A protein has these predicted regions:
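Short beta-strand-to-loop acidic/aromatic patch adjacent to the donor-nucleotide binding site
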Residues: 80-91
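Cell-envelope/extracellular polymer assembly enzymes that use nucleotide-activated donors
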Residues: 2-5, 32, 172
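Acidic donor-binding segment of Leloir-type glycosyltransferases
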Residues: 24-59
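Short acidic donor-binding/metal-coordinating loop in glycosyltransferase active sites
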Residues: 62, 87-89, 117, 169
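Flexible acidic/His/Gly-enriched loops in nucleotide-sugar-dependent glycosyltransferase catalytic domains
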Residues: 53, 63-74, 93, 97-155
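Conserved nucleotide-sugar donor-binding catalytic segment
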Residues: 131-204
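Short, well-formed alpha-helical segments that are part of the catalytic scaffolds
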Residues: 12-25
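C-terminal subregions of glycosyltransferases and related glycan-biosynthesis enzymes
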Residues: 26, 172, 179, 192-290
Length: 290
């Protein structure tokens, strides 16, 4: 069975305990857990220690060493073939880990898998979905934040080694670098409730994976708001400029549609404000290039 390393930030001990409890019920599914801690205290170690008899779990203390936090996590997940950066907003369904493993085994040439969290619950009305249901509602075709991506670790290692200066301080940039350098073709797999349905259109893959990873760069962040000390307008402006850089041929309407889809699922990003900030950012960029 494929081994997946789930990397969890130790931001809130109650949330950490709940997430580890969910994973402990799937201990025979073939995975291990890495708790990433920046607090400098023993709290996360104590919580993780309570689950060591149920599953493979360890805690890594992150440092201000100049390396991106995600890279420190990746180094600590030594030997892991697949990694999933699991943010606290994501709740695992009972069969999700096994389903991911089966999809990876069935499609060995793919490097990135999308884990469609909402699919098992489409039969439930919104108000009666099980407690702890993933708190963001996606329309058909929408894509979850990076925490629903399972990524081949070697893709990240090779991309970082090829151009560490271009990696920035977040995972979105290094994945973008992996696409540009052609180290591997980041393939896409939607893990659905039923049979997996590969999406092989390169243009669709390029747009969806890179745009949404670029968005994550300016959203909540893996380790929380303290890593992104910007108000909503500043984040939206940065996001707009990032999208314009990645996709110079995109029209304003295309970019606005992308931004509005994110505004639906991200609390601070309200549609009208998002659209107006994006329009202003793109206008400023066009003027600077004129």
């Amino acid at each position: 069975m494929i081994e997946i390393c789930f990397i969890i930030p130790a931001r809130n001990m109650d949330t950490l305990h709940r997430t580890l409890s969910m994973l402990s019920f799937q201990k025979d599914a073939g995975f291990r857990v890495l708790v990433a801690d920046r607090s400098g205290t023993e709290a996360a170690h104590d919580v993780a220690a309570g689950f060591e008899h149920q599953m493979t779990v360890e805690t890594v203390d992150l440092e201000n060493s100049g390396l991106p936090l995600w890279k420190q996590c990746l180094d600590a997940a030594r030997g892991a073939e697949w990694v999933c950066f699991l943010t606290p907003q994501v709740d695992l369904t009972p069969s999700s880990v096994r389903r991911m493993s089966r999809c990876i085994e069935d499609h060995p040439s793919y490097d990135i898998f999308h884990w469609n969290l909402t699919a098992p619950y489409r039969k439930y009305p919104l108000k009666t979905r099980p407690a702890g249901f993933f708190r963001r509602v996606f329309r058909e075709g929408d894509v979850a934040p990076i925490s629903s991506f399972v990524i081949r670790a070697q893709v990240l290692r090779e991309a970082f080694a090829a151009d560490p200066d271009a990696a920035g301080m977040d995972l979105a940039v290094i994945l973008s670098a992996a696409r540009k350098t052609g180290i591997r073709s980041a393939r896409w797999e939607r893990i659905s409730y039923n049979a997996p349905a590969p999406v092989d259109d390169p243009a669709w893959v390029e747009k969806d994976v890179r745009a949404r990873l670029a968005f994550f760069r300016w959203s909540e962040g893996f380790f929380g708001e303290e890593d992104y000390p910007l108000d909503t307008g500043e984040r939206l402006t940065l996001y707009a400029n990032e999208l314009a850089r990645l996709y110079p041929s995109f029209t304003y309407e295309e970019l606005k549609a992308d931004l509005n889809s994110f505004a639906v699922v991200s609390g601070p990003f309200r549609k009208m404000r998002a659209a107006s900030v994006l329009k202003a950012a793109l206008k400023a960029r066009q003027e600077s290039l004129a």
